[in-house]
């Protein structure tokens, strides 16, 4: 199957941010604390410079006899300089404490939420698999789970509270500067809005597409590297190393080109921001001097408004700078949200067990089943009856639909028409957990985790004793081999079980099925990688277990069918 390309309409930045902010709800009280602490911290930094200006005015008024300075709103005129300096020291210390506390709260929220999001993503993947994940680009999924989620730290630690802090601080400063004259307040408001809203929106609009291109390209590069590592032996064997190297170099250059474009946008945005700050600062100076000459404000207003304007851009500059990284962050957020919101093809049925209590397993049946992968019909009006206590063989060539019927019995997919029932009930009505407990499924390719052999077998039964694991391994004809290893059952199998042969991995998979001890065992080509001796041992174990279990044996080998009580021949999705 081929992965479908995502043709869904892109979300707006505000919609992405709204969805991400919605996840903060459990930690809203900490977010409010971060906003208050951050606002107070910035105000401390701003008023530190304003107080310094007041000291200058104070000195001019008290130490420059004969000066003709006009003072209208000198709020610290009667305060001793020593007191002002003491307040400045206290404010400077508070600034550091408040900034630390704000950052602590923000990062606590960020890392707590990243853990929650990872949990949600893995839960979503579990619901989507295998129907929605078969054929999906695994490198891109890894990129979403790792780097995309990690990038959300920028949003939660350095975006949400800075937006609120910038808004609150700007509002307070507009009121403070505006108390000298309405025009100074309007100029401050215009400058803050330009730096914190207009410039980021302009930069975000032109860079959002590039941000998504970079995150998608990064995921595709991850897939390519992963694919190259897995196929390293074949690459070397067929002399494709140079070609693979050129392909990787080409992909890296494309990604670098996108990153350079983003960097250029970042540079131009910084330049525009700095230009606006300079224009606003000198504009405030010019405006206050003009108002001073007209008697609109006093000299302290000229100095205080200019200093306040120059020193109060910190919160809005921080907000403006966010848009540089925000393009990639929001692209990552969109990819994560799309995965979380993707609807599974098969909805899980809640519950732990079917009603009716303990009873004898009633077998399984497929009745007039039609099933297709997208537009390719695999099963057409297919019927099959699996008697309890019997071994049923399904024989046919590759691509005839043998494996598909096992996946439908496991309810990895739902049928388009017809009915699949297990233990007398439609699989679409059986609680998913109970269905999984009733069935053991051994696939053609056994996946082994980077762990010990014992733990790989014990996946089928958490908490299994070593004796139970060994008994299952004996039935799967793998026990003797395991005992020849230096560490026996504690031997690490390596990544993807690369230290073991295909046949050894397959037998460990069969050992899992024996350990799971389910009422029905589904075996997809269980002996394809085995020699005739080991095939005979495993088939003998299956025959001995058949009286108490329902076994479905899928294979293209005629010899494997010899152990079956009933054999169905499959051809093009039909019984022949």
Can you say where each PLM-predicted feature lies in the sequence?
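Hydrophobic alpha-helical segments in the permease module
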Residues: 84-95, 99, 192-194, 266-280, ...
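Transmembrane helices of ABC transporter permease
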Residues: 26, 30-41, 158-213, 286-297
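Membrane-integrated ABC transporters
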Residues: 1-45, 63-81, 102-106, 110, ...
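Cytosolic ends of transmembrane helices, especially the final helix of ABC transmembrane type-1 domains
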Residues: 237-240, 264, 305, 312-341
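ABC-type nucleotide-binding domain
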Residues: 357-576
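Transmembrane helix-loop-helix hairpins at lipid-water interfaces of multipass membrane proteins
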Residues: 31-98, 178-183, 299
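Juxtamembrane helix-loop junctions of ABC transporter transmembrane domains
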Residues: 13, 45-53, 57, 87-134, ...
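An intracellular "coupling" helix at the cytosolic face of ABC transporter transmembrane type-1 domains
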Residues: 22-29, 127-131, 147-156, 160, ...
């Amino acid at each position: 199957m081929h992965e479908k390309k995502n043709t869904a309409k892109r979300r707006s930045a505000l919609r992405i941010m709204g969805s991400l902010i919605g996840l903060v709800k459990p930690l809203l009280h900490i977010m409010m604390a971060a906003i208050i602490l951050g606002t107070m911290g910035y105000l401390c930094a701003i008023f530190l410079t304003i107080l310094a200006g007041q000291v200058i005015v104070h000195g001019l008024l008290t130490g420059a006899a004969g000066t003709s300075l006009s003072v209208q709103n000198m709020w610290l005129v009667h305060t001793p300089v020593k007191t002002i300096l003491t307040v400045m020291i206290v404010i400077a210390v508070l600034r550091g404490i408040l900034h630390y506390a704000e950052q602590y709260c923000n990062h606590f929220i960020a890392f707590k939420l990243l853990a929650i999001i990872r949990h949600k993503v893995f839960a979503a993947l579990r619901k989507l698999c295998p129907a929605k994940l078969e054929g999906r680009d695994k490198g891109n999924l890894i990129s979403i789970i790792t780097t995309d989620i990690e990038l959300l730290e920028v949003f939660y630690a350095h975006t949400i509270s800075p937006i609120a802090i910038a808004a609150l601080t700007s509002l307070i400063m507009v009121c403070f500067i505006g108390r000298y004259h309405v025009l100074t307040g309007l100029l401050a408001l215009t400058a803050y809005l330009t730096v914190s809203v207009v410039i980021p929106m302009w930069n975000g609009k032109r860079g959002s597409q590039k941000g998504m291109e970079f995150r998608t390209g990064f995921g595709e590069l991850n897939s390519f590297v992963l694919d190259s590592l897995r196929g390293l032996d074949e690459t070397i064997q067929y002399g494709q190393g140079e070609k693979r190297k050129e392909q990787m170099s080409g992909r890296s250059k494309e990604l670098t080109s996108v990153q350079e474009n983003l960097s250029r946008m970042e540079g131009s945005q910084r330049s525009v921001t700095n230009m606006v700050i300079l224009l606003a600062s000198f504009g405030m100076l010019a405006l206050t001097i003009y108002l001073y000459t007209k008697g609109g404000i006093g000299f302290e207003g000229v100095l205080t408004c200019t200093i306040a304007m120059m020193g109060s851009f910190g919160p809005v500059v921080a907000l403006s700078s966010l848009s540089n990284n925000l393009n990639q962050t929001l692209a990552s957020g969109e990819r994560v949200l799309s995965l979380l919101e993707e609807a599974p093809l098969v909805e899980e049925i809640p519950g732990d067990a079917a009603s009716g209590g303990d009873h004898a397993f009633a077998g399984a049946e497929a009745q007039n089943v039609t099933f297709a992968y997208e537009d390719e019909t695999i099963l057409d009006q297919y019927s099959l009856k699996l008697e309890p206590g019997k071994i049923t063989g399904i024989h046919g060539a590759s691509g005839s639909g043998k494996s598909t019927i096992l996946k439908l019995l496991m309810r990895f997919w739902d049928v388009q028409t017809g009915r699949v029932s297990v233990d007398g009930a439609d699989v679409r009505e059986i609680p998913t957990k109970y269905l999984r407990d009733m069935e053991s499924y051994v696939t053609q390719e056994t996946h082994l985790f980077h762990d010990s052999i014992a733990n790989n077998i014990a996946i089928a039964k958490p908490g299994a004793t070593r004796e139970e694991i060994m008994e299952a391994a004996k039935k799967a004809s793998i026990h003797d081999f395991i005992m020849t290893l230096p560490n026996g059952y504690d031997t690490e199998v390596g990544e993807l079980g690369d230290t073991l042969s295909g046949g050894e991995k397959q037998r460990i998979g069969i050992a899992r099925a024996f350990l799971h001890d389910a009422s029905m065992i589904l075996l997809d080509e269980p002996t394809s990688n085995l020699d005739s001796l080991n095939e005979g041992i495993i088939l003998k174990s299956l025959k001995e277990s058949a009286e108490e279990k329902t076994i479905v044996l899928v294979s293209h080998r005629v010899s494997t069918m010899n152990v079956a009580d009933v054999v169905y021949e499959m051809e093009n999705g039909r019984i022949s």
